């Protein structure tokens, strides 16, 4: 939009300013008309001053636009204009005719008197039939067509005289005829006494004192006749107000511009008008009458337009009212039919109700309300991506809000749309929803069964009322985990548990996580029999429920639950997260948080322990040395033998053999046999706990709890220890080359050289759990403690428990692995084996030393805790007493083995999980660390690239010389420094 331009117009030392607010829509004709009206001029010539103060004429729209551009650019939106009055071409002989006839210029019709003046101007071009002399003399100027003959002067003067005479006579003739015509039309002016008096009275009213003009128009505001200045709306021609009303308040759109008129035309000098030509009074009266008629015509036309517009508006209002009435009828009809169709009232004829409603509709001015069906999603109980076990029964709840204005009835259902998830009842494609009123919130529930195959499953639903769908689409999306072999029906059936009960137990474990808010009490009765390997099936009593779903409390979960849910997923989560202190998110059931002093850092290659060729020191092929590969190479008969062991018994056997170190290497164990040349045995240091077996990482491996078998005696164990120490010293240099940094990528594989004397036919890590679960005074107390047979009843162990708790320094049985009475397996019974006093007393205390192979561990059944008392986390069901770090036998004499640190790092994740399951709060007792061991740890840290000696020493003291935690914190510090320097 162009800026506003101010026009400073000067005429005879009188200057007026005009503000052109919209130059684009203001034309030159508008400006010229405004100037004429403002200065009371008829013929004008407007000129503007350019930047050199030169006057330039404006006669067209293009010149006017050029002037505006110049004003915008060079004169600051100001345009100086000069107005010059144009010369009249009408002769002074008949000025009164021009004056009177120009009074009708704005009416659109010009009288004959004006054309008579044009005849005088045109001269000989006019040919009148009344003057034969003009016809006779007209051929005379035809001789002037010859360009070579110039007319003489006398001829030219004669023609001018003739022209004036012809024009004068023609005008007089026309005026005479006009006067005769007016006399014949005298009846309209019959109110006047005579022909002469009427024009006089009209003249008196036409020219009032002070040179004011009477418009014979009523003011649109005060309804009086306008005399003098008249203001007419530029947009509404029918709106006219007088000068007094314009000065005060008036009812009209303030945005409309009012045009000011003093008189229709410029009034000439009156004395000359009256003295010389008194006769043209009749034409003046005629013009006044015609003006009034034109004004009346315009007024009538405007009034008709106004009435027409009002009529259209009334029609539109009537149409809108009819539409609203029709809408009211539909609404009442729908409500009446809906009310009659309710089950409480029989269906009747709504004609009478409709008629009564239609009669009363005009009396109800309420706004129309359309019946709308709408819903909004509020909340759900199972978020997308929830992990479930195959065959799990669960119920998905959606909280929905009725956001419409129609109450949900029995016809409102949750309709199945599409999906691949299995319904508990395949016939129920439409689920009933609660009858919610408008604005209320309810719960819509659907029962599902997790498919047997792993994968992601989704099912979509939408609300529907009588076949009309509405509201948002809701869905249930779950992730079905693969069926672990430890819980497969085949293995459980071979252990004496039917496949159906195994599936139910899996479902029950899942329900504890999915529907914990709808817990159903569970009573479990476990029958325990004497013996080392016999177990009775677990008997569960389900509470009465229509859905037959078992929803146990979290506190009722047993060690089997913890092992099957916690340990199986540790390695998988570590591969995904690779962050310390990271707890598995989607693992079910919920677990207590792990201690912060044992972060989850693990290499996924721990399950693939490779073997190095003895002679050349070269690495063997990873595919040929993976433990799981070796299992596949064994004969089918051996596999069948191994499958007799369930997954939980396998884990239990591993843990028990790690704790009860009185068992000798069994060369005919129930698990897979391996050749002596390829036997490997993991070992741990003081902080090392359970090793993550390949079965924990691979979902097709089997885990099974089993009771300990007869082991070697003390002399055999002592011999094994010495052999292991000698070979560890010899191969330390070879292992040093194989050591990987604790902070390296998680995809690395470790190659660990172990002595051949280690029996790998048994579960991995015979003693890896012992050091973390035994007391420092274990060896001292073991000497005087008599052995307890493996078949001892749990009651005897319960009697011994208070005594041991009251005398922690004198007990010979250390921390106890407690298996809840809810397990299907036979309860673990305490078993104590003797140890040579010389060996136990000579064992030096050290945290980073080779693992004990000969420390006795007592397994004891603790008193069962009543269900109503169980409110502590699951970790509290593990050991009765808090653990302390023990003193171990050293495999090397002058420093800790790098291989020991490597194995400790490899077993860190399993240790953390085991501590979370079976240990209490960490003990603050710090073992004595020698300077040589500290120096070895410092050298190990330098090898890893951590060369800040002061920081290393400070972190070693902070973490009790736990190199794993030191490396973890160093990595975190380095990462933080990298981020701070980068950003």
UniProtKB/Swiss-Prot annotation:
Positions of Zn(2+) 1 binding:
219, 222, 242, 245
Domain of life of the native organism:
Eukaryota
Modification Phosphothreonine occurs at = 588
- Kindly give the PROSITE patterns that the UniProt entry links to this protein: PB1, UBA, ZF_ZZ_1, ZF_ZZ_2
Alphabetical list of SMART domains matching this protein? PB1, ZnF_ZZ
Summarize the PTM comment: Phosphorylated by GSK3A; this phosphorylation inhibits NBR1 involvement in the formation of ubiquitinated protein aggregates.
The UBA domain sits at: 930-974
Q: Which CDD domains match?
A: NBR1_like, PB1_NBR1, UBA_NBR1, ZZ_NBR1_like
What does its UniProt record remark on the domains?
The PB1 domain mediates interaction with SQSTM1.
Q: How does it assemble?
A: Homooligomer and heterooligomer. Interacts with TRIM55. Interacts with titin/TTN. Interacts with RNF29, USP8, MAP1LC3A, MAP1LC3B, MAP1LC3C, GABARAP, GABARAPL1 and GABARAPL2. Binds to ubiquitin and ubiquitinated proteins. Interacts with SQSTM1. Interacts with TAX1BP1. Interacts with IRF3; this interaction mediates autophagic degradation of IRF3. Interacts with IL12A and IL12B.
Q: Per its record, how is this protein called by name?
A: Next to BRCA1 gene 1 protein
